[in-house]
Amino acid sequence: MTKAEIISKISEKTGVEKTTALVVVESLMLEIKDSIRQNESVFLRGFGTFLARKRKEKTGRNISKNTTIIIPEHHIPAFKPAKIFKEEVKNNVK
């Protein structure tokens, strides 16, 4: 499902215009991104938590030059689904 499809579904279910739904969806995404950039988690009860996970420093290979490189410690965005959400998917996806 794409962002456009999500906006259409929200518009149909709530009766709001697509432009309003677009503003709401984009605002939600922006707030989640801003919070994660500041290393704050976003908890949505019954859905899950958006957070920044730390990746440790590690060694890797540059295959084009055949050299070893150091990949520094960094953060990546992550999503941890709520227990109830995982159960719903487990029991209903066919």
Model region roles, listed by residue range:
Residues 1-94:
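Strongly charged
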